[in-house]
Amino acid sequence: MITQERLLKVLRAPHISEKATMAAEKANTIVFKVAKDATKKEIKAAVEQLFEVEVKSVNTLITKGKTKRQGLRQGRRSDVKKAYVTLKEGQDLDFVGGAE
């Protein structure tokens, strides 16, 4: 069993972008930035326990950090792991709910 402390460290933040918003509307999929060492089972357990929803599937990917320059100095942004979490039919999770 995964500890409560580990579940809180797995999910970093929701990833809000145009592509993520379209995925949420069309496929009932939520995108999260997650810890680099997180597994799909840990991500599924964390979402189900923290948000009280049922997860259908989890797809993960690692986006490589971009190379950036400032004058003569060159640096690199960190790599980020993202998880596309598809919820079961009838489940809903809204991060960007509009004010009424």
UniProtKB/Swiss-Prot annotation:
It holds the Pfam family Ribosomal_L23. Keywords: Ribonucleoprotein, Ribosomal protein, RNA-binding, rRNA-binding. InterPro entries: Nucleotide-bd_a/b_plait_sf (IPR012677), Ribosomal_uL23-like (IPR013025), Ribosomal_uL23/eL15/eS24_sf (IPR012678), Ribosomal_uL23_CS (IPR001014). GO terms for molecular function: rRNA binding; structural constituent of ribosome. GO terms for biological process: translation. GO terms for cellular component: ribonucleoprotein complex; ribosome. PANTHER family: 60S RIBOSOMAL PROTEIN L23A (PTHR11620). HAMAP family: Ribosomal_uL23_B. NCBIfam families: PRK05738.1-1, PRK05738.1-3, PRK05738.1-5, PRK05738.2-4. Belongs to the universal ribosomal protein uL23 family. Part of the 50S ribosomal subunit. Contacts protein L29, and trigger factor when it is bound to the ribosome. This is Large ribosomal subunit protein uL23. The gene is rplW.
